[in-house]
Amino acid sequence: MSQSILYKIANPYADALLELSLLNNAMDKASSDLSMILEVISKSADLKLFLSNPLVEDNLKKNVLNQLFKDKVSDFIVKFLMVLVDRRRISMLHLIIDKYFSLVYKTESTILTEVITAIDLTEEQEIALINKIKVMTKGKNVKLITTIDQTLIGGFIVRIGSKVIDASLSGKLKQIAFYLETN
């Protein structure tokens, strides 16, 4: 299935999850629970395969999810996971949670920013970058998602929605190469 179709399927579930977290007055708790669930599932390839396998019975999936998360996350999150199993959407959990976080950030007026760097940013650099992004976007909160890509050689790339700011050394070299080729 194409990514856009998968996101269209994930949207109503993410909307419902956000509504549930707001009704339970537990958006922060739900967000931390979902982060923990994503971390557990992403660390275990076997669990990921198990949950996405259509041949595994739903009751078995529910039992495993209950054993893993029942005492660690909110009841409404566990019930939500059971609904996903019943509707055969548990394999889309990662997409649903991603979309949920996008909705949370929009609700909190948080600007989701992807930063790709050649090396780790220091805490001071992150704070300075967050402050610059706040000024640029007139946003209240900025959430940085940092990724290391050593092919950048130096500098960084910032993605805010559809905007891309390429301040990397490899980007500058590509610009110079393009300029030399066209002249």
Swiss-Prot record:
It is found in: Plastid, Chloroplast thylakoid membrane. It comes from the Eukaryota. PROSITE patterns: ATPASE_DELTA (PS00389). Its main location: plastid. InterPro entries: ATP_synth_OSCP/delta_N_sf (IPR026015), ATPase_OSCP/d_CS (IPR020781), ATPase_OSCP/dsu (IPR000711). F(1)F(0) ATP synthase produces ATP from ADP in the presence of a proton or sodium gradient. F-type ATPases consist of two structural domains, F(1) containing the extramembraneous catalytic core and F(0) containing the membrane proton channel, linked together by a central stalk and a peripheral stalk. During catalysis, ATP synthesis in the catalytic domain of F(1) is coupled via a rotary mechanism of the central stalk subunits to proton translocation. This protein is part of the stalk that links CF(0) to CF(1). It either transmits conformational changes from CF(0) to CF(1) or is implicated in proton conduction. This is ATP synthase subunit delta, chloroplastic. It comes from Antithamnion sp.
